[in-house]
Every structure is written in structure tokens, then in C-alpha cells.
């Protein structure tokens, strides 16, 4: 998402300061005012950014995803919650220094949901933002914590301090579904079975799908995801009725992915070998999400 977002912001004439774990490719780096290789858990780096730049808008994309997070949950918490706290603090310090609210865009995830059973999922219909908030993964717990931290920094930060800056942050978050990109191969997410199937077929490789054929969760394409993030960023604050929004595009089953892949790549070799752990995670996520609030408040479509 970061590369596509840099492309979109650069195309709109916005100066971008980027931070990634690794050096950016030259073509992406050329679209940034500055770029740093570093870690959001490195407070010295964030202090340096605070000293060097006046920041009006932050897109906080860094995260350790759901599958990887279950192998190292404590590390996931350090990155996903500790890192988010660090970047929120940077935003608040920017607001205090420059006397202007900092807009903070936080990509959350359907992993923040936790339906109690497959039967509950099958009968839930389109799930709204405030339902089933008991995630089954550390990543989901972390995303839920990030949403609440953002709400706190926007409305209640340093509530008892005499020198507090009221409402330093304009926090806006989207609970993204699974995201499909034609540009990058996914890694580390539990919704990756769909895009992995597509990329494997395009490369002529066999693919073992780790969920059942009837498994269904929401997905969207990467261009749709970036469009949603930018639409929310540009929405007038007075129109927003909440800090966290669902967005949806389509909800195919894993069997639908296989059927469409075979239409494009007739010789694709796809088998279904469900992994019980990852299957249980995906079964705890909604089959469909209600995005009525996004459509009403900021014209998502």
C-alpha cells in the first residue's frame, strides 16, 4: 500500500517524507521529498523527523500482520501498538509545536472483528463497525487498540495536564478487508490466500490454498484501498460521525477465486489443503461488512 500511496500523493503534488524498514527503490524514492530507512519503534528517528519537518498529515501503515503476529505475538504488540503509540506521540508533538491539528490516517483491518463461531458468521449478515469486537489474533487485538488510541489522542489526550493541547490529532481509520495487488506478492497476512492463488497461477506455479473452498471474507483491490484512504483524508471533518469506518467491495469465496483464476489461467494447479489454525482465524472474520457510514459520511463507493 505504501508504494501506491506515495504514487498517488506525488501525483497530487504533495511532498512526502517516507519511512520504511528498507531503503526505497529508486523509482519510489524519486517521488518523495525525503526517505528514511528505519523502524517506528526507534524513538530517536521519530525525534529527528519531529525536529526537521512540519508535518500536517500522517499515513501510518507499518504493521506486523496477522499470520506472522501469531508466531511472535509479543513482537507484534511492540510494533503494532508500541509503534503506533510512538507515531501518535509524534503527531501530538507536531500539533503542539506548530499550533495545528495533525491529520492521522490509520489503516485498520477486519482482523479487529472476532465472531464466536462459524454458525454466528453465517448468520451475521453485513457486520457494522461496533459489533463482534473480540478479535482472535494479536494483530486484530493490536488494530483494535490502535483505533482506541487514536480516539484517545483525538479527544482526551493529556486530559488533566494544565498545558494540554486540546484535540491535537484528527484521527481517521478504515477497517480494510483483504487487499489484492497486481504489483506485489503478499506475505504475512491470513487473507493472502486469494492474492497468493492469483500470483501463483500467473507465475505457472501450483498453489495449495490454506482455507476451505466455501470460505468467504470481504476483499478489495489495492487501487480501491488507496482511493478509500484518500477519500477519507479529504472528507470535511464536520461530515464525519465516527473515527473508524468499514469499506467493502466484493466478498468472493475461495472457490470463486479458483474459478476466476482458471478462467484466466486454464492450466492453473490449485488444491485446497485447509490449515486448521489459519482457517479458524478467517472463520472469525465477517463474510460481509456494512459500509453504510462510509457511504453516507464521505461518499465511499
Where on the chain are the PLM-derived regions?
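Glycine/proline-rich active-site loop of Rossmann-fold NAD(P)-dependent oxidoreductases
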Residues: 144, 167, 179-195, 222-223, ...
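C-terminal substrate-binding subdomain of Rossmann-fold SDR/epimerase-dehydratase oxidoreductases
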Residues: 205, 210-213, 218-301
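Conserved Rossmann-fold NAD(P)-dependent oxidoreductase catalytic core, especially the SDR/UDP-sugar
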Residues: 85-138
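A conserved pocket-lining segment of Rossmann-fold NAD(P)-dependent short-chain dehydrogenase/reductase
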Residues: 69-70, 130-134, 161, 166, ...
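Active-site Tyr-X1-5-Lys
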Residues: 115-118, 134-171, 202
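N-terminal Rossmann-fold NAD(P) dinucleotide-binding loop
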Residues: 2-3
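NAD(P)H-binding glycine-rich loop region in Rossmannoid oxidoreductase-like domains
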Residues: 40-79
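Rossmann-fold cofactor-recognition segment
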Residues: 30-42
